[in-house]
Amino acid sequence: MKNFVKAAIAFSFLFLFQMHAQAQKLRAKDMVVTAHGWYGTDMERTRPNLKTYGYTTYEASVGFQTNPNDSSAYARQFGYPMLNFGFSLARMGEFKFYDQTKFSDLYSLYGSFERSLLRKKRLSLGYLLDFGATYNPNRYDPVNNPGNNWLSSPVMAYFGAGAFIKFHVGRRWEIGADAMFRHYSNGRLALPNEALNALGAGLFARYRLDDYDYKEYTGIPRIKADYKRGMQYMIVLGGGVHTCMAEWNAKVETEDDATKKSGIKLKAHPKLSISVDALYRYALRYASGVSLDVFYSSNMKELEASDRIVYGDEAVEKCPGYSPISVGLALVHEVYWHNLAVHVAVGAYPYRHKGVNGVEAKEAGDRERGWHYEKAGLRYYFPKLGDTFLGFAIKSHSVKAEYLEFSAGVRI
């Protein structure tokens, strides 16, 4: 499990650095330095032991501003985005509890993509996306910290998305404000994992080393886009590991107090998938289409046994059954930055037999039996290797993670 987490983090930063390297040739004069303060609140308002919901975050980042002098057609069509690499300190140790639960501060390394959608004199409006990894030193412990059932892993994934407004104060300085959604989770590598979702707002100040005047980002001749328009097909193999919420619920009901206090042990089950994607590339940045997905789950015997404990024999006998195979159909969209793609999919299952129905399971905190699913992740294409690619994504149900999937495939 530890090696799997390390591989996930290594994959994340491989993609981030590839994105940066392809943006433009790195030069000190294109650098920007940013300091950011942010205040957020936990979106989940039903945690019984939590007394206060707010916390502060402090961030520092170094980035590179793409510009019309030396950037590619991708940079032009994205409006000359900024690519940042930073460190954040989320002061979740500020949470106060009604019991003895303890939270610690979270430490994150991340990459950020910042794009201006509107530039008007000194004003810029746009959006930003963060991807990174987080270290959590004070996690769930059945003996010393049983109330922290949100974050149970030492290393987690971090994702952020938001909108910003900024003002150019002179040639080199910027000040601004943003509103962001932030998500911390281990991708169901371990339980309990209620995860943490937060909303908040912040202020930032930025110093630019580049000499390119912000007033000159409009009225620039269009750079010819070199891409292959038309249909493209992908064959994808994927896999990951998963801890099952139904098994957790069953053990909570059946284990004695001594076992619960010493820690409930869960097996991590392999998950496999094969997909065939058909996408139409209609712009340099975008391709959309459909995907046929076949998923394999290896824990059907354990799932049935757990359902008999949680829901009873009668509910299990009435259910459609327990098949390790599920078939999904999904709408797919990819957004490209050179050979890097953000890959998202929203799908439904025409065939899926996972025991008791989704409504009953969802009431028990198990959302993975629903009729629809989502995927969001990154792919990196290797044109010189026959258009093969590597990728990873979070597969989820109702935005609740099922597992972290690594994938490899070929585009034909």
Where are each of the predicted segments found?
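Short loop/turn motifs that connect adjacent beta-strands in outer-membrane beta-barrel proteins
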Residues: Q24-D30, N69-P81, L118-L125, V169-W173, ...
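Glycine- and aromatic-enriched membrane insertion/assembly motifs of diderm outer-membrane
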Residues: R27, Y53-F95, A258-V332
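Residues that define the transmembrane beta-barrel architecture of outer-membrane proteins
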Residues: K29, G54-A60, G79, T101-L109, ...
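Transmembrane beta-strands of outer-membrane beta-barrel proteins
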Residues: M31-A35, P81-F85, L123-F131, I175-A177, ...
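Residues on the lipid-exposed face of transmembrane beta-strands in outer-membrane beta-barrel proteins
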Residues: A35, A60-T66, L109-R115, L129-A133, ...
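Transmembrane beta-strands of outer-membrane beta-barrel pores
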Residues: G37-M43, T66, F87-G93, F131-P137, ...
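Outer-membrane beta-barrel translocator domains and adjoining extracellular loop/strand segments
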Residues: R45-L50, F95-Q100, N138-N145, G187-E194, ...
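Outer-membrane beta-barrel "beta-signal"
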Residues: V62, N197-T218, A401-I412
